[in-house]
């Protein structure tokens, strides 16, 4: 009987180890890895619960009013499959300086340097200094597959019926 219990415990421990390894592998596969030669340019979150990492400029550059500039960051990023990185604005740049961050999508297989496209909508030349926080990177889950349906079939299956219906812009009111 004691031998049977020892065998059972050994089997249970082995199964627990396999489960733990698979669990850790799952966590690893969902981590975002930043690659940067200059520690001063590492992205960071001020608070653990922030949605995005602040991205810093790797160069000094001036952006004239009405002009665009692609700003080097010195940063490469490894994003897990099933996710993408979205370059988004930092609200202070727009409000205080009229600087707009243009759309930026980083697919999970992209490995080159991340650049941030800024547009100066203000009336003064805007100076970007190395180390300035110029954008934020938010990593978001995506769907990896889709199904195409003819309109008639989608309607027949009830996919197009919702409580909201076809109501769009402004349909929920202001208050």
Please provide the spans of the model-predicted regions.
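DUTPase catalytic domain/fold
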Residues: 2-175
């Amino acid at each position: 009987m004691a031998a049977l219990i020892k065998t059972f415990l050994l089997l249970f421990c082995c199964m627990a180890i396999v489960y733990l390894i698979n669990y850790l592998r799952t966590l690893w596969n969902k981590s975002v890895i930043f690659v940067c030669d200059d520690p001063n340019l590492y992205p960071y979150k001020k608070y653990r619960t922030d949605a995005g990492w602040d991205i810093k400029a790797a160069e000094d550059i001036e952006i004239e009013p009405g002009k665009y500039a692609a700003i080097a960051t010195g940063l490469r990023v490894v994003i897990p499959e099933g996710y993408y990185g979205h370059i988004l604005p930092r609200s202070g740049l727009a409000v205080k300086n009229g600087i707009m961050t243009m759309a930026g999508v980083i697919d999970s297989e992209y490995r080159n340097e991340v650049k941030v496209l800024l547009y100066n909508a203000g009336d003064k030349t805007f100076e970007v200094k190395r180390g300035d926080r110029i954008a934020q990177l938010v990593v978001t889950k995506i769907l990896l597959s889709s199904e195409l349906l003819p309109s008639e079939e989608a309607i027949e299956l009830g996919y197009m019926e919702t409580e909201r219906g076809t109501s769009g812009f402004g349909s929920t009111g202001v208050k």
